[in-house]
Amino acid sequence: MPDTTRDTHGRRTVLTGIGVAAAAAAMSTAATPADAQPAVATETFWNQRYEARKGDVKLQLYRRRLKAPVAGEAPLPVIILVHGSSMSSMPTFDLTVPGAGEYSMFNVFARYGYDVWAIDFEGYGRSSVTPGWSDIKAGVADLAAMMPIVERETKVQRGYHMIGESSGALRVAAFAAENPNRVGRLVFSAYTYTGKDSPTLTERAKNLDFYRKNNRRPRPKEMLESIFTRDKAGTSDLRTAAALVAAELPFGDTVPTGTYLDMTSKLPIIEAKAIKAPVLVIRGEHDGIATEADLLDFYSQLPNADRQFVTLPGMAHTLVLGTNRELFWYASHSFLNMPKPLVTV
């Protein structure tokens, strides 16, 4: 049975009517980063948790809307938020940072009018910890196990929008290639293609032998804190690091090794031509995992002409938790909410 809860979070003023570049200029000239944070006010959301099964593996699902579903009402568009290698879903997409404004993508996209879902992959968060590696392939199976519950609860059978963060974007890409009829519009945040000239992956590959021999890797406080400084200092509010540590470490100080093994020894995971859905590839200016040239190579091979490539200024690898995160929300929602073309020739 689903676990129904209610909680209160902040309301932000939605940035509308201007492009991403103009929004960046407004944020950089009108106020300091501390003053420019999205405003927070009291608001109540409708939340539920569910448990999916992949054999004996229990997978925790999360859901948020502005209001409870009402029988007979048209369903809301469904969006699934997909976490990366080192953090589970709720610390990634529903983080509270005291005094620093809104960080919760659950809140933001519920306000935009979506039925928002997320999953803790095998070995992460509230899902089962197993002897498995929880690699990209396993993540695809986890997403597949999630689908019957999403369909049952939302009454929507296909066209699920998905936003993947880092290795979560690789999971989304692989899932979309295998299940083209399930997905709608896709956002690949902090994506990785071949890893060519990546300083972060070059450094990470020094531990390849460890990744091959161990199904879990250390993920201590210091590693979580480094996410906010390793690419470019000043792109994140360091209060966010403290909040993330407090939210994530209760789940333990290790995480599965599979995605690190995939990203240091098996890239490219999926060829661009295999993804038929509309895609937004979105990269932070200072991302140390994937170069702009590598991602433009991937982008140029996407077969669907309904595609966009966006570089966000003043941001590093983790767009979800960066100081300029409003730009990420704006770009993602604008792409997901695009009108359908009148003609395709």
Which sequence ranges carry the predicted segments?
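Conserved alpha/beta-hydrolase "acid-adjacent" motif
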Residues: G288-D294
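N-terminal secretory signal peptides
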Residues: M1-H9, A22-A23, M27
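Catalytic histidine-centered segment of alpha/beta-hydrolase-like enzymes
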Residues: M315-R325
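Alpha/beta-hydrolase
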Residues: T200-I282
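Short, surface-exposed "cap/lid" segments of acyl-processing enzymes
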Residues: V70-P75, I79-R111
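N-terminal cap/lid segment of alpha/beta-hydrolase-fold proteins
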Residues: A39-A71
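Short glycine-enriched nucleophile-adjacent loop
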Residues: A169-P180
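Conserved acidic catalytic loop of the alpha/beta-hydrolase fold
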Residues: A141-R158
